[in-house]
C-alpha cells in the first residue's frame, strides 16, 4: 500500500516527494524495516501514532547516506568523548550527541519519564569520557535511535500540551520542527521556523516539517 501511494504522489505532486523520489522511497522502506521496533518501544501506540512518530524523522531517514555517516561518526568517536565536539548528527535518524544528552536529562528530572525510561537511559559510571563514548555507541545503533525517538515524543507531548495540536498533521508539523530545529523552541519560534526552507542539508528548497508531513501522508494506509 505504501509503495502504491508513494508512486501516485510521485506522479502528481510538485512537493518534497516529487523533488526527492529516491529519498522518499528510502524513507518508506526505512519505516517498514523499523516498524516492529517502533511498536516494541511504543506498545500502547496506535498505527496512526506509529506513523506520526516515524514521520518526525522520515526526511532524515530518507536522506541517510551510510558513507557520509561513516565519516561523521568516525569524527565524533574520535573527538567527542574527550572534548564534547564535534557534535555532528549521526546514525539512521541523524541525532546529535547533545540531542541525546538533552533527552537523557529530561528522563532523569521528570518523574514520569524517569519511571518509564530512566533505567535504560542511565549510565553505569560517572566518568564523562566513558559516558560520552557510550552515548556515541548508542547513536550508532538504529534500535537505540528508535528508543531516543520514543523519549523525544513523550518529552514533546508534555512541552506542547497547551499548544492546541489536536490533529495528526499539526503534531507532525510541530514535533518535526522541534526535532529538526531545537527541542526547547517556543511555539512562536516553531511557527517561525516552519517558514524557513533549508532542507535537505545545504539547500533552500523545502521546510523540514513540510517534508515530514508529505511523508506522513505517504505512510497512511
Model-derived regions, located:
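Classical Sec-dependent N-terminal signal peptides that target proteins to the secretory pathway
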Residues: 1-7
